Amino acid sequence: RVNSIVLKRCRKPANEDILVPGDTVCVIGTTSTRVPYEECDDMRVTPDEVKLLLAEGEKLAPCLNDTRILRAYAGVRPLVAAEGDTSGRNISRGIVLFDHEKRDGIKGFITITGGKLMTYRLMAEMATDLVCEKLHIDKKCETRETPLPGSGKGDVQEVAKNIWTKPSTAQKATAGRIGSFASKLKFDTEEEKSLVCECEEVPESEVVNAIEHLDVHNLVDLRRRTRVGMGTCQGELCACRAAGLLGKAHGCTQRAKQDLVQFMNERWKGMFPVAWGETMREAEFTSWIYSECLGIGDEAEDGTTPETPVFE
């Protein structure tokens, strides 16, 4: 993690203009490129985009030149374009709510789009209020007054004090992820106390809690709930442990193995554009563990290209 506060260029929206800290890492971005509709489900980061972000990012934080880069990722933003804008940079990041009955004469259909994660609760409120209005329900959305689950009992420091059986750094990490729910985790056995993900300090008890209570069905769900696989090793050491717990909970080890392969392929997809130095060594070690030690996936008969993970 390079910085503890947001570093932002005060200028009109452009490439590589913000460095944001989050959990144990920081994220630099963004670039903006128009892509064909048929490619939206398979976004790829290019080497040129990575070079551009790092070169410009060093102007915000010179230490980026010596900082280990874990991964790069790309996604599609559902923004509404203005007529005549070809760059995409002048597209509003604001929220757009369409009532298709008024707009297109289609009853029973609305669209909420635009915005970003920071505004999702406002988007939910706007959409809910419109739906209630159209269904003649005299009630307003309550999300602005309702704390998110786990967030209603003070700050992270206070919550962490209730997790007595963990090191202080791990207490803060767990409390930061699940808030006051952390006090409900069990640490009665050595297994419950053991770490599934050492990079992010995620204990087995937190993983089991997520599987049982947080609608976790696969490793991607678990990653989003607990940050398993998002640390330095990118799932190298923790993904198998987590897959084992999922297989045990769901009673299907074969599905857990398939889930593990898919999860590691997605981790590789993010590592490939930044595969140099320590990240390259980590990727090679991961490949060796999964292919040679665990026998998960074999190389193709015609050889494996750098763009294809050897454990696929």
Can you annotate each of these PLM segments?
Residues 1-29, 33-234, 246-247:
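C-terminal catalytic lobe of FAD-dependent flavoproteins
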Residues 62, 235, 239-265:
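Long, charge-rich, low-complexity alpha-helical segments
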Residues 251-312:
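Low-complexity, small/polar and acidic-rich linker and loop segments
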Residues 162-164, 236-241, 273-284:
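Charged/polar, low-hydrophobicity segments characteristic of intrinsically disordered regions
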